[in-house]
Amino acid sequence: QGLFFLDGVMYESTGQYGESTFRKVDLATGKAVKRLDFDKKYFLEGSVELKGNIFILTWLNKVAFVYDAKTLTYKSTWRYPREGWGLTTDGKSLIASDGSARLYFMDEQFKQQKVLTVKMNGRPVQMLNELEWIDGKIWANVYMTDMIVIINPADGNVEGTVDCSGLLPKSLRDADTDVLNGIAYNPKDGRIYLTGKCWKRLYEVRLVER
């Protein structure tokens, strides 16, 4: 549900009721170095680090959690006013999606600062899900599709798209395999990683312009 890098280390939040976790992951093996398990009533969604804290959204629980980024110790729980989907940051604000065409900019207490409507060719882009801030742009995967849109954070206009169809071969798909749903950028080396719900692989990708 959430995927991001902090100091060259990958972190991941996973969903489903009774299965939701937050994990610090060894990129080489894919195994959890440290793992937080959540009560079965919670369905975790997007997560991100901002100013020394890790923020984690829930889908329908209307709460968000804050943990210390260094120790992964619990700090606080906040009321959250909408469905939690994706979460990223520009280094100043939290930026969240809720499955609509809107992105919500918030402070660290989840107080709304502004709302951005994302449009492509003048039309709102619905079902924005997982988010990642990459080189001054917001990348968002469009839920239930293999498309990522690259968004100008100033005006909400889509400036490009990434076609991820064919990323996961049929040989690695099974009954549990779900949609594209993971974008992570490692600012230390500029690498971009993509994955999906219940995928058995994490892919390092490079864009080819078409």
Annotate the PLM regions.
Residues 29-66, 72-84:
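Blade-loop segments of beta-propeller domains
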Residues 11-16, 54-61, 96-100, 140-144, ...:
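Conserved beta-strand positions in repeat-built beta-propeller and related beta-rich domains
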Residues 35-40, 76-82, 116-123, 162-166, ...:
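Surface loop/turn motifs at the tips and blade-to-blade linkers of beta-strand repeat domains
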Residues 128, 175-185:
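Signature of short aromatic-glycine-proline-rich micro-motifs recurring in repeat-based ectodomains
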Residues 64-121:
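Hydrophobic, well-structured mid-protein blocks that either form specific transmembrane helices
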Residues 7-8, 51-53, 91-92, 135-136, ...:
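Short coil/turn segments that connect the beta-strands within blades of beta-propeller domains
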